Amino acid sequence: MAQIRHPLFVSITGKIDNMVFYRRNGKVFLRRLPVRKKRKPSESQLSHRRQFTAVIAFYRVLKSTFLLQVWRAAVENTLMNSCCLFVKHNCRAFDDNGKLTDYTCLRFSVGPLARPYCLKCRWLKEENAVRLTWKNNVRVGKQKTDDQLVTVIVYENDEFTVYSPQQTGAVRRDGTVTLLLPPDSSVPCAAYCFFAGVSSGFYSKDCYCRIRTD
């Protein structure tokens, strides 16, 4: 601590960088703030940070697709935002280095509607398409048979294509649909299918299926 006698500093109080000017008994004093050393993050903290960063980056990609409204619908009338909910459901799909490693833990949709059952997927190489088949739960009412199909196809190079209800053109009662893949796309490896309510604004959880390429 040092007393300041120069007239230029008589009216100064407050903090400048790591120095504090303050008055006491009509005198101005200068005191240096203690330097706080930052703790080095642990390996566990660094791993969590890499994982979290990767999931956030993945969410930002999804924001440009139809899937954004799915996650917004899931948090309606709650205190959670869509990004936090997406991170909560998808962290397990990424490893400690932030790499997507477990496709079975990847979630593209959440919601209360019934999922497709017995989902099967096959790559039609000559047609550059994927054929999907599914069954419906007998407890699904007739009014739900018009629920629209939404599909996400993931490729071996980790790219993916989102097919909105308008693009699939399929509804729950159809039980099958064939989706054309983009030209020059990589080999498809996984499909995620779920249903969107026609007027309810609700969705189902997605159903993961490994695509047969044999």
Predicted regions and their residues:
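Charged linear interaction tracts used for macromolecular binding and regulation
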Residues: 74-214
